[in-house]
Amino acid sequence: MARQPYRFPQARIPERGSGVFRLTVRNAMAHRDSEMKEECLREDLKFYFMSPCEKYRARRQIPWKLGLQILKIVMVTTQLVRFGLSNQLVVAFKEDNTVAFKHLFLKGYSGTDEDDYSCSVYTQEDAYESIFFAINQYHQLKDITLGTLGYGENEDNRIGLKVCKQHYKKGTMFPSNETLNIDNDVELDCVQLDLQDLSKKPPDWKNSSFFRLEFYRLLQVEISFHLKGIDLQTIHSRELPDCYVFQNTIIFDNKAHSGKIKIYFDSDAKIEECKDLNIFGSTQKNAQYVLVFDAFVIVICLASLILCTRSIVLALRLRKRFLNFFLEKYKRPVCDTDQWEFINGWYVLVIISDLMTIIGSILKMEIKAKNLTNYDLCSIFLGTSTLLVWVGVIRYLGYFQAYNVLILTMQASLPKVLRFCACAGMIYLGYTFCGWIVLGPYHDKFENLNTVAECLFSLVNGDDMFATFAQIQQKSILVWLFSRLYLYSFISLFIYMILSLFIALITDSYDTIKKFQQNGFPETDLQEFLKECSSKEEYQKESSAFLSCICCRRRKRSDDHLIPIS
């Protein structure tokens, strides 16, 4: 009898009204819904990582943010240049007046400072003459000055100058017998000389006991006075003039008691609002135009700040969608590298620059309105913001492969460079402290830590090598030999070894980036997920209009339809 072939039982087709049929349809719909959700997420991710030009070609979306950034660069740079020219006039006026004051009030001033002090005296007669010369010049100021200067009130609201002297309380000294008896308590005596006192004839103030100085006890004599001036050169730039208060101080320093009294001159200029300005012409109108321009810059920066903040918020929402989807489908979290891809550092840079530009523009408007006089703080904000704005241009250059190498090389080499600099910095600090303590008494460039650090840094760049070797004093043969060993070892170590290794780190990162560009970068989970997009484009084209409608309707029920715009 022939053996019949085995027949597999046929699957039972569920009837339309049965529960199995409804479950099958529900599973199919859930699968279809999951696929649509995945495709929508993949499409949003792909659009987010596009360049502005690619976004325009993909959806005809005008890159408003790119245009706004270009306009902001032009406006901020123009604002900085105008403020820089105005600030240059302020600095020049202060420096010129300081030089004029030194020639007016310092007897025998040659035009160049001897060191950190202006000049010096070596005899008692020269000391008395220098003190009396400064006082007499102050009295005759209006007759001898070439500038727009006048007398100002001091802290006591009195017009005049104040003379103070510091000296030890009491003591006797006999150097020939090597005998010293002194009380190291310091006394401070001051006298106020008004214009009326200085105008008396004969000038009896010179014969007062206050000016009988015992130089072996004297520590210093300080002459302080206030002057007022008006900067008229701003009118040529169609700006309102500034009124200045110069707080001048002349110090005769005898603390070393070395037979040399160093004379220091310090002038602290403060800008004050002029009480009564009557200027005819277009200067006032020009100031109003500048204020309107600054207000327009603030509006542009506010718009840029809002757009970048919005993009970061939407990027974080998109990141949350991707993390939840990845965890739900693949049952594992996304790596940290992929998570940081959603945090656009350029947006953070733009936000910081916008905030600094807004603050700097407000300060600049207050300065123009003569309600604020702090040019330095405004310069820091405007200068730093302009620096960040121009650095942000690199982001758009990075879309081109030829320019992107610089950005990728900096990103790849930065961690290694920072670790290397930390190690090299320890050696650098060691040389700094050693040079300061050993060579400080014998070399001008090693007198303090700040100067030593600057000197060593210039040696690394190859500057002033011969001058550094030649200026060492040869009073001590031991120190002279140590200086040669110190300088030769530092130059050899940092130029031929540390600096070469520093360059090698950057070169290695550059070579690695070039290989990756030729052979492809290692793909992360995010890149592999986006790579599937190209393989499913045909499916997206053949998808029904009903599914597209469902996808759009589902996205409208939440904030997922908001896609970050670059």
From Swiss-Prot:
It is a multi-pass membrane protein. Forms homooligomeric complexes; probably tetrameric. Can heterooligomerize with MCOLN1; heteromeric assemblies have different channel properties as compared to the respective homooligomers and may be tissue-specific. Interacts with TMEM176A. The lineage of its organism: Eukaryota, Metazoa, Chordata, Craniata, Vertebrata. Channel activity is reduced by low extracellular/lumenal pH level. This is Mucolipin-2. PANTHER family: MUCOLIPIN, MUCOLIPIN-2. It comes from Homo sapiens. The chain crosses the membrane at residues 66-86, 289-309, 347-367, 377-397, 420-440, 481-502. One of its GO terms (cellular component) is lysosome. A motif (Selectivity filter) lies at residues 461-464. Disulfide bonds join C164-C190, C243-C274. Residues 107-123 are annotated as: Extracellular/lumenal pore loop. Pfam families: MCLN_ECD, PKD_channel. Residues 449-469 dip into the membrane without crossing it. Gene3D superfamilies: 1.10.287.70. Keywords: Adaptive immunity, Calcium, Calcium channel, Calcium transport, Cell membrane, Disulfide bond, Endosome, Immunity, Innate immunity, Ion channel, Ion transport, Lysosome, Membrane, Protein transport, Transmembrane, Transmembrane helix, Transport. GO terms for molecular function: calcium channel activity; identical protein binding; iron ion transmembrane transporter activity; NAADP-sensitive calcium-release channel activity.
